[in-house]
Curated annotation (Swiss-Prot):
Negative regulator of class I heat shock genes (grpE-dnaK-dnaJ and groELS operons). Prevents heat-shock induction of these operons. It comes from Desulfitobacterium hafniense (strain DSM 10664 / DCB-2). Gene3D superfamilies: 3.30.450.40, Heat-inducible transcription repressor hrca homolog, domain 3 (3.30.390.60), Winged helix-like DNA-binding domain superfamily/Winged helix DNA-binding domain (1.10.10.10). GO terms for biological process: negative regulation of DNA-templated transcription. This is Heat-inducible transcription repressor HrcA.
Length: 345
């Protein structure tokens, strides 16, 4: 059985009406709301065929039909028309992200909050994997006698601050020279590469400050390590938006969902960086059973061709896919542009 143009129009109408009302859709509703030029009886027959195809299904308590996961998938892949974002919404996104760009963690966290507010869905933004990034640059700030603040910027844009013992009588000029040597030798390299290939050169150029160099390298090793606690940070926004969805009025269902939200590591497992475009995972396609009533839309934000993190929206399978996909796409492109400009400056 093929999906001809008439069936496609009816399926599109069912999905759009169900997204809007959260109520099962009947043939008379379609005939009344959508100008398809066909009778309720004909619509009923076509709906029967689509039920056999597994694209729609009948809830136990209703005579109407709702889209199945397969129906949503067909809609997203074959019927969905590309949505655009209003200029005033674009202005809000650009303004709110630009004014917080000084600190990468801040802009990422705020992007999550902003995305949930604009869509009324649950947003998720995965920050840079702190453990995977190489060294970019560092500098020292005076702190107190015998100590300085070592500011380290990783290649992924994450900034780390550490207090380092520098010893007595170390001048600001000497600290600057040490930072210059580290920046020149280590930029773009992991700590493993530094230890393997560069320690001799660093010590040769900085023979007078062995105590400070040892302390700085020890702290750098911790900052650039691949330890579990240095993994990607998950920023969730609008988790309470799920409580407003009719699908999640069941207490047990929402409890299980919120437990997944609290366990960031579980969320990371189901979100994978995309080389390009968006990923849409619908209902039963999700690996976690707690997310089987949800759809997830994700995109990847980048810096100079390097994937930095993931942005996504989680909502009921009955979400407005066009709007949600447009928002995720625009947010990923905005973050990519802002973070790339920030890095180059």
């Amino acid at each position: 059985m093929q999906m001809d143009e008439r069936k496609k129009k009816i399926l599109r109408a069912i999905v759009q009406d169900y997204i809007s009302t959260a109520e099962p859709v009947g043939s008379r509703t379609i005939a009344r709301k959508f100008d398809l030029g066909i009778s309720p009886a004909t619509i009923r027959n076509e709906m029967s065929d689509m039920e056999e195809l597994g694209l729609i299904e009948q809830p136990h308590t209703s005579a109407g039909r709702i889209p199945s996961d397969a129906g949503y998938r067909y809609y997203v892949d074959c019927l969905l028309e590309k949505s655009s974002i209003a200029d005033d919404v674009k202005d809000v996104i650009e303004k709110e992200t630009t004014k917080r760009i000084a600190e990468i963690q801040t802009v990422i966290a705020h992007s999550s909050k902003l995305l949930s507010e604009l869509t009324h869905l649950t947003s998720i933004v995965i920050g840079p994997d702190k453990g995977k990034s190489a060294f970019n640059q560092m500098h020292f700030l005076p702190y107190e006698p015998g100590k300085a603040i070592m500011v380290v910027v990783k290649e992924n844009g994450v900034v780390e601050n550490q207090i380092v013992e520098i010893g007595e009588n170390v001048t600001a000029e000497e600290l600057q020279r040490i930072a210059n040597v580290f920046n020149h030798k280590m930029r773009g390299h992991s700590m493993e590469e530094v230890k393997r290939d560069m320690l001799h050169e660093i010590y040769s150029e900085l023979t007078r400050q062995r105590f400070l160099i040892d302390n700085a390298l020890e702290l750098l090793s911790a900052v650039l390590s691949n330890s579990p606690e240095e993994s990607s940070k998950v920023y969730l926004g609008g988790t309470l938006n799920m409580l407003n969805q009719p699908e999640f009025r069941d207490v047990e269902k929402i409890r299980n969902l919120f437990q997944i939200f609290e366990e960031g590591a579980q969320i990371i497992k189901v979100l994978h960086p995309q080389k390009e475009g968006l990923a849409v995972t619908i209902g039963g396609e999700n690996k976690l059973k707690e997310l089987r009533d949800c759809s997830i839309i994700t995109g990847t934000y980048w810096i100079d061709g390097e994937p930095l993190g993931t942005i996504g929206l989680i909502g009921p399978t009955r979400m407005d896919y066009g709007k949600a996909m447009a928002m995720v796409d625009y947010m990923t492109r905005t973050l990519t542009e802002l973070l790339t400009v920030r890095r180059r400056n």
